[in-house]
């Protein structure tokens, strides 16, 4: 299995680069599973939004990891609580929205 794990995608330019190039990379490198850290993907480089998550999933991302900056965009709290493909840090305060880990097939 080939796994691609990309570090911090930051702001609009990082999102654009990812969305414009990921599918080609997946095909050319025969990638089976893609993990991206998206905690700084929002337009100002802080936080994450539902819209960005959906864009990432649509361009080939399988799982989005986050960090403490994920909460900088408050709208993500309800979404991350329902979306199994978006993960918050496991060692975050309890009870925090979302999941700290998951198993994917």
Segments the model singles out, each with a brief description of its role:
Residues 1-105:
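Acidic, metal/ion-coordinating pockets
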């Amino acid at each position: 299995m080939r796994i691609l794990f990309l570090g911090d995608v930051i702001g609009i330019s990082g999102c654009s680069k990812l969305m414009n190039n990921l599918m080609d990379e997946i095909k050319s490198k025969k990638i089976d599973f893609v993990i991206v850290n998206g905690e700084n993907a929002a337009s100002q480089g802080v936080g994450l939004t539902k819209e960005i998550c959906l864009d990432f999933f649509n361009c080939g991302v399988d799982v989005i990891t986050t960090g403490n900056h994920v909460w900088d965009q408050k709208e993500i709290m309800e979404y991350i609580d329902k979306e199994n493909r978006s993960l918050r840090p496991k060692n975050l305060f309890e009870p925090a929205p979302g999941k700290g880990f998951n198993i994917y097939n």
